[in-house]
């Protein structure tokens, strides 16, 4: 129970932190773009194979679908319709980067909790180590736009940032649930050093993704 509670607690805190960062980076998507699919994909991957609970995979899948969809539109193979699968790749990179940055922090802070001793035979010698298996559910909010012809909005103007008003669209926040996980094993490092190194690498990858998307 304590392990589950800690996963829920750190997951909620991480989700709030991620939402703040996404808002600061002005990450937004059109409501018709189905950006929420990235969270659904991560949950499906978690069910199929926990080691693939990674938004890099989910983002790559959704980004590929968006690119193929737009190529088909440009080739006049399908009608554009609304903003279906119109996903700004820069915003998608920042979204994936922020989630990875937060994931790295989670791994460094909470990744060693619940680790179990394991043993293996290497070159005829029995060695002991630790196995890690953690999954955090992160509730996150995203700014979603919906193009409107009606100039009147129920959202108080004083509560809407200028960068949202400049789009000429109706904006709203929606909550999504994503899963990030950490599954690894070590026979050469201590529990603390293993999660710190892994967390640093994951966060560094996230920072690179953010810089590419900015």
List each language-model region with its residue ranges:
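Hydrophobic transmembrane alpha-helices and their immediate loop junctions
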Residues: 1-214
């Amino acid at each position: 129970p304590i392990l589950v509670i800690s996963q829920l607690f750190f997951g909620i805190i991480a989700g709030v932190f991620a939402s703040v960062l996404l808002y600061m980076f002005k990450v937004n998507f059109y409501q018709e773009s189905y950006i929420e699919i990235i969270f659904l994909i991560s949950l499906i991957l978690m069910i199929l194979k926990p080691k693939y609970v990674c938004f890099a995979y989910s983002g790559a899948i959704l980004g590929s679908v968006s690119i193929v969809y737009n190529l088909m539109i440009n080739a006049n193979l399908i009608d554009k319709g609304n903003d279906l699968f119109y996903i700004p790749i820069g915003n998608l990179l920042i979204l994936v980067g922020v989630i990875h940055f937060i994931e790295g922090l989670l791994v460094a802070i909470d990744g060693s909790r619940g680790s179990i001793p394991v043993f293996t035979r290497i070159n005829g010698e029995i060695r002991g180590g630790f196995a890690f298996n953690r999954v955090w559910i992160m509730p996150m909010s995203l700014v979603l736009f919906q193009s409107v012809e009606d100039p009147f909005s129920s959202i108080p103007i004083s509560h809407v940032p200028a960068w949202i008003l400049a789009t000429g669209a109706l904006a709203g926040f929606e909550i999504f649930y994503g899963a990030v996980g950490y599954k690894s094993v070590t026979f050469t490092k201590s529990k603390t050093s293993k999660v710190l190194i892994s967390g640093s690498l994951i966060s560094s990858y996230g920072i690179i993704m953010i810089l590419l998307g900015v």
